[in-house]
């Protein structure tokens, strides 16, 4: 399986994601610059964490206009797997590919720590290898990662089983403990925790590898 990792000016987790899917997952990957108009022959796309365009105006608000995002939208529309991690999640929300918003954390502080969470569904290409009973230890690192949506949207996410991950330790104040969500077609997911930073035992946890393993399983079945 070939992963495309999008690189925006200000991305700082692109090489982490690249390493996770190559060294830890054993797959191939390509770094794709923000001004590219094509994704090439990739099977899945990752929008990594960081501070795209300095997070000016609002996190992801400028990145959504990058030339590569037209290709990402088409890729997603054609059913391709798209994963947004942290800043990547914020970009997907700004681009209208995922519902809701990511706002300032509870306490208005940047939070960098390992949290406990669980997969809230296994019915997705990003969580099919997960055990919903297993507690995952995956770090967060954000100042604007509190998931917010109106009650109607939250109820829709619940009813349609589109909450991908929930915090056990809800440090940022996300509504209904939401750590990750899916689009209606279930081929796009955004999550604020960093699975690429928990994909190697040397990092203290390999729990995040389940996200990439799930994508691989979904790709093999497809």
Label each residue range with its predicted role.
Residues 50-51, 88, 143, 195:
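Active-site metal-binding loops of divalent metal-dependent hydrolases
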Residues 88-89, 123:
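Short, flexible active-site-adjacent loop segments at beta-strand->alpha-helix junctions, enriched
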């Amino acid at each position: 399986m070939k992963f495309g990792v999008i690189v925006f000016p200000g991305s700082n987790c692109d090489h982490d994601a690249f390493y996770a899917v190559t060294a830890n997952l054993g797959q191939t990957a390509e770094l794709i610059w923000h001004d590219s108009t094509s994704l090439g022959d990739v099977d899945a796309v990752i929008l990594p964490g960081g501070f795209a365009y300095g997070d000016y105006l609002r996190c992801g608000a400028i990145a959504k206009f990058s030339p590569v995002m037209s290709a990402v939208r088409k890729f997603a529309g054609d059913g391709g797997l798209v994963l947004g991690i942290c800043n990547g999640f914020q970009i997907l929300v700004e681009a209208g590919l995922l519902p809701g918003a990511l706002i300032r954390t509870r306490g208005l502080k940047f939070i960098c720590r390992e949290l406990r969470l669980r997969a809230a569904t296994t019915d997705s290409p990003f969580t099919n290898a997960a055990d919903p009973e297993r507690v995952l230890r995956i770090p967060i690192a954000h100042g604007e990662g509190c998931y917010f949506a109106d009650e109607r949207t939250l109820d829709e996410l619940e009813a349609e089983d589109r909450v991908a991950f929930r915090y056990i330790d809800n440090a940022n104040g996300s509504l209904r403990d939401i750590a990750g969500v899916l689009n209606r077609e279930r081929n796009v997911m955004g999550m604020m925790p960093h699975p690429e930073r928990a994909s190697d035992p040397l990092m203290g946890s390999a729990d995040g590898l389940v996200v990439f393993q799930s994508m691989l399983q979904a790709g093999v079945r497809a």
